[in-house]
Amino acid sequence: MSHRIRHLSCLACRRKKVKCNRQYPCTRCLKYGEACTYDERDNRKKRHSLSYLHSLESQLARLESFIMTLKNSDPEGRDEMLKSVVFSDHLTEPNDQEVKSEGPIEYPVFLNVQDSKTVSFYGPTSAYDLSLPDITKDNKTTWNFQASYSPMVSECLKLFFRYQYSQFLFVYRESFLSDYYYNFHDGFYCTEHLIYAICAIGASMSDDENISRHSKSYYDASWQKLLEFGLDRSHLTSVQCLLCLGYYDIGMGNTSLGWLLSGLAFRMGQDLGFQLNPENWYIDNSPAISSADSDIRRRVFWGSYVADKFIGFIMGRPTMLKRSDASIPGSNQLPEFAGLEEFKLNVTDYMSLTDFSVCDAVALFVDLSDIADSILLNMFSPTSKNRATNINCVLSNLGKYNLELMNWHYKLPDTISWRTIDLKKDRIPNLCAVSLYYHLIRICLNRPFLSRKEVTANDLTPKTICTDSINEIVTVIRAHRTANGLRYSTLYIVYAAIVSCSVILLLRDMCTDSELLTLNNDMMFFIEVLKECSQTWKLAQRSIVLIENTLKGKTNSQSTSEFVSPISDTENGSSSQQVSEAKDIVEPSDVLDELQKFDLLPENDDNFQTFQAFYGGPPIILSPNLYEKKLNEKTL
């Protein structure tokens, strides 16, 4: 007698509908001397596949639409429609050998474990055989870095997290500082090269010259320590370090190097599989990564995702990280610890005003980044279908994205929807950064269409949308300047000012006298903003020169005295000379003569020869006039 338990009752018990013990032979058949046979086919599990059901629903919808059209057609039209019907593409039922389960298909995933927290990821198409030993492991020694608690380093860290955190969300403040002060994660999230990278950014905005002059030294030290650590040794802090250095270079006007470093960071992150949910990874029936480490990886990925979209958008270049490749959940907030208040800005007001958290800011940045990426792909990509059609299709797509941005703003919960009164007081720094990003996207989307009179969304023209966003940007920057000063500005402020100036330059030729007065005031405001930001970011300093070079080309037809606010500084920032600003009216020739005394533009760099090529953004692909000219040629 076999003791193997079957999944189904024997045929005799099933026929008589009595209980069977599912052994062979079963006790009932053995008792009554009947033949005990089993049918191994389990028809209970024979169900239609999910794809078959979806296809059937789709075909049913098409059939219903066809019948309704047929009903409303004239006799001749019905005959033509019936002749066109073909049933050769009908759906077929999958046979018994097809998919057995409705669950997701499990693809092979390979994890190369480097240490208790670092895992390299290889997907199902990987050509690497991970059963082979990793020859690089023995050549690397584990680090034993002890954090330096010098007052200068501490001050740089405080400046970074107080004023720049909304721009560097891929650095998880709680995990970094808990490792820096308490070695909570055994120093895993606080490596030497990351500390120096953060200090380079923090030192650049210090009012103390003894600290600010070390900014470039911190940058060089970070890069050197990163090379010693090993670029072939993928690590989360190396991803964060590369992104910090990339942002630093972009802020100093070295856009090509910043682009390369950020791209290297994203590739290293993908090597770590940081876009995937590590909670599904098991090694020897144990989680490959702890829950706390998983939460930190979430923040690093989504912060990197926002950085990728922002950098790609302001440069008008393709992005690397795709939403469709990510399975990792949203970011969670780690517990705070004593002393963290020193690294926050306006802690009392911030906490009492709203429950808006850093995780909320990350979620909003991610949503806006998705919209920005879609705009870049579908509106300004050289292979975009809309670019290949006439202007009406382009304007229709423009209206769609304007409406999407408006709906996103209007649907924000009351607890996180920004109000003008909140922006004026600058009491929620992260929310103000989100607001600047939102208006930056709106302006870059509508800037190539300023001369169009067509209404694109909610009875608004591209010109109206851009001017409204400029007014909001002025409100935010004024509040930040009053509360903190523009020495501590982020690149969101710098690029918002640059893009606003570009719109004002375009609007000068299509405005009334009353509008021109407002544009003059706004231009003066933004030039002063860039001048103050140039103390931290050389990008702002160079942009002023290029704005003035653009105005130089217009002096033959219109005086630029209302716009020009002279500045001067040397290229390496080691010394500066103050240009007299006592004149109430500055003649264009006087300003240009002063500017020629200083070498503010990089040598042999064609990227900085024109303002349009410098400020980046989607319109860098085609200038506004050329963009519309090509579209009109398509319609002829």
Swiss-Prot record:
UniProt xrefs under SMART domains: Fungal_trans, GAL4
GO BP: any one term: DNA-templated transcription
Cellular localisation: Cytoplasm; Nucleus
GO cellular component: a single term: nucleus
Positions of the DNA-binding region: 10-36
Key words of the record: Cytoplasm, DNA-binding, Metal-binding, Nucleus, Transcription, Transcription regulation, Zinc
Molecular function in Gene Ontology: DNA-binding transcription factor activity, RNA polymerase II-specific; RNA polymerase II cis-regulatory region sequence-specific DNA binding; zinc ion binding
Residues passing through the membrane, by range: none
Chain intervals for the UniProt region annotation (Disordered): 556-581
Polar residues bias locations: 556-580
Keyword DNA-binding: yes
Keyword set includes Transcription regulation: yes
Protein name: Uncharacterized transcriptional regulatory protein C757.04
Organism listed in the record: Schizosaccharomyces pombe (strain 972 / ATCC 24843)
